[in-house]
């Protein structure tokens, strides 16, 4: 790597693996006291931002690491051997080469965030999840349930199609 820090890498890797191993609904409930401390409440869309962000971070961090690891190290060595510095490597090789994979990771993360935000509705996070639970499930209103499911499917399909199109336009395969 450019600036190897094996101890920090091992520590961050362990934290990321722990974060990825927790089911989101468990994390959501476990973070209630922390959310109350940070935001002052555990209800509403503002409160939902805390667990949704903490839940998505390890997933996106691992996708980013994998995207950057895919870049051919020969290109990095070539830039360094021609007198380039770390910034040249980052902006002339790492980011341009990893961009399609990074965008695919961003697309996956956005899709996951849609699901996470819906799950946050279960504990009062608002949004479509709250609508589905309160007005669909608890009131036995199948039309509301199916309507929210259709909206969620449409949102995910739209994000995925746009992300795939963007990745295809930037990939140099």
Show which residues each predicted segment covers.
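Transmembrane alpha-helices
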Residues: 86-119
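Alpha-helical membrane-interface segments at transmembrane helix boundaries
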Residues: 12-19, 99, 103, 107, ...
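C-terminal transmembrane helix and the adjacent membrane-cytosol boundary/short C-terminal tail
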Residues: 146-173
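Glycine-rich helix-loop "coupling/hinge" segments at transmembrane-helix boundaries
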Residues: 116-146, 150-151, 171
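Cytoplasmic-entry segments and transmembrane alpha-helices of multi-pass inner-membrane transporters
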Residues: 1-30, 52, 57, 62-66, ...
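Short helix-to-coil transition segments within interhelical loops
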Residues: 68-74, 78-98, 138
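Residue-level signal for the membrane-embedded core of alpha-helical transmembrane segments
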Residues: 22-29, 114, 123, 149-153, ...
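Membrane-embedded alpha-helices of multi-pass transport/permease systems
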Residues: 46-50, 54-76, 106-107, 114-118, ...
